[in-house]
Amino acid sequence: MLPPGLESTQMKQTERRILLGRIVGAFGVKGELKLESWTEPRTAIFRYQPWIVRAPSGQESVVSGVRGRDQGKNLIAVFPGVTDRDTVEAMHGTEIYVARSALPPPKPDEYYWVDLEELQVETVEGVKLGTVSHLFSTGSNDVVVVRGDRERMIPFVFPDFVKSVDFDANLIVVDWDPDF
């Protein structure tokens, strides 16, 4: 459940939104929230506002003016108008999104993972491997998970394995053995 006073929203169906984190608990008794952030660095989540928050019930609201700080393994945030622990505990599990348009453009030869999802993947020989399902990081490099006739995990490394990314063609070309 989201607290009263947060503006309800119905996002445009065409506007893509990005999941940046979630509320994982209460901190103290004055309405502060513990957040888990998936941004790099994790405090960058506070730069991208307004947030679209989605409660586990499906209720969505828009929140602006969230302040926060780094605290141990979590971030601590203060939502405008939230001043007690009970309200925060009711928000546990709430997901934090922003509109894709709220993010700055990536640097040349860098990509937001969300922009790569759903792109088609084929080899330099033209063999279709499938569609990007998701990506994950191994620490040393990112890996693109491609779902087609089977699932493949391809290191997202230029120019060794990834030869090109073409958003206009909706295509990633890779140097990859289709039997691997």
From Swiss-Prot:
Xref: Pfam families: PRC_RimM, RimM
Domain PRC barrel: 108-180
Family of this protein: Belongs to the RimM family.
One of the protein's GO biological processes: ribosomal small subunit biogenesis
Keywords from the UniProt entry: Chaperone, Cytoplasm, Ribosome biogenesis, rRNA processing
Organism ancestry: Bacteria, Pseudomonadati, Pseudomonadota, Gammaproteobacteria, Lysobacterales
Domain notes: The PRC barrel domain binds ribosomal protein uS19.
Gene (name only): rimM
Subunit annotation: Binds ribosomal protein uS19.
Molecular function terms from GO: ribosome binding
HAMAP family for the chain: Ribosome_mat_RimM (MF_00014)
Name of the protein in its database record: Ribosome maturation factor RimM
Function: An accessory protein needed during the final step in the assembly of 30S ribosomal subunit, possibly for assembly of the head region. Essential for efficient processing of 16S rRNA. May be needed both before and after RbfA during the maturation of 16S rRNA. It has affinity for free ribosomal 30S subunits but not for 70S ribosomes.
One Gene Ontology cellular component annotation held by this UniProt entry: cytoplasm
Compartments it resides in: Cytoplasm
